[in-house]
Curated annotation (Swiss-Prot):
Organism: Acaryochloris marina (strain MBIC 11017)
Protein name per the record: Large ribosomal subunit protein uL4
Pfam family, one: Ribosomal_L4
Transmembrane segments: none
Subunit structure: Part of the 50S ribosomal subunit.
Keyword Flavoprotein included in the entry's annotation: no
Segments for region (Disordered): 41-80
SUPFAM superfamilies (UniProt xref): Ribosomal protein L4 (SSF52166)
């Protein structure tokens, strides 16, 4: 159970918000969150790194010198991995890095990661109506009133897409905006502070509670 004070646009206390999520037990929490994080980062890899072996490098068909009698080491190709311009031994080839993890485990890891950041969570009332037009300055001032440092990495969680908030937030270097339905372990762990609207908390409870 996570209990948070809800702040309004002016930064004043405006009530309480509760979030009741089933999390992993203490012995397994770090392990399951780590697995989910590795899965997410592995699945983000393109896997297109490629190098050429000695048989794929252009040239090298002619034997550089005869086998015996020169006093030099034997050489059958100028594209040997030992030579400059030669092929690569055990280099990367295109492959899939995708990692499987059961859906129930993924959701448990996500809930556990979110609950672990409760101390860094700031819950605010829905403030879309307070921004009559896109204005980054107004959003930064509001974050200051909420006790959020704009110079630290901040994750802003909304229930639904709001164009005015998006346009106001996109020019803030260390502020990342995501929807409650798109929560992921990496963003939750990478942020120094997390700001969530009341409706986003309700959406998280609805979508991720088991």
């Amino acid at each position: 159970m996570v209990n948070c004070v809800v702040r309004n646009w002016q930064g004043e206390d405006a009530g309480q918000a509760e979030l009741d999520l089933k999390v992993a037990n203490e012995e397994n929490a770090a392990h399951i969150v780590h697995r989910a994080l590795r899965r997410q980062m592995n699945n983000a890899r393109q896997g297109t790194a490629s190098s050429k072996t000695r048989s794929e490098v252009r040239g090298g068909g002619r034997k550089p010198w005869r086998q015996k009698g020169t006093g030099r080491a034997r050489a059958g190709s100028s594209r040997s991995p030992l030579w400059r311009g030669g092929g690569v031994i055990f280099g990367p080839k295109p492959r899939s890095y995708s990692t499987k993890m059961n859906r129930k485990e993924r959701r448990l890891a996500l809930r556990t990661a979110f609950a672990s950041r409760a101390e860094d969570l700031v819950v605010v009332e829905d403030f879309g109506d307070n921004l009559s037009r896109p204005k980054t300055k107004d959003l930064l001032e509001a974050m200051g009133r909420w006790g959020v440092n704009a110079d630290s990495k901040t994750l802003l969680i909304l229930a639904d897409k709001h164009d005015t908030i998006y346009l106001s937030a996109r020019n803030v270097e260390k502020l990342k905006l995501i929807l409650a339905s798109n929560l992921n372990v990496y963003d939750l762990l990478a942020a120094d502070q997390i700001v969530a609207t009341q409706s986003a908390i309700a959406k998280i409870q609805e979508v991720y509670s088991d």
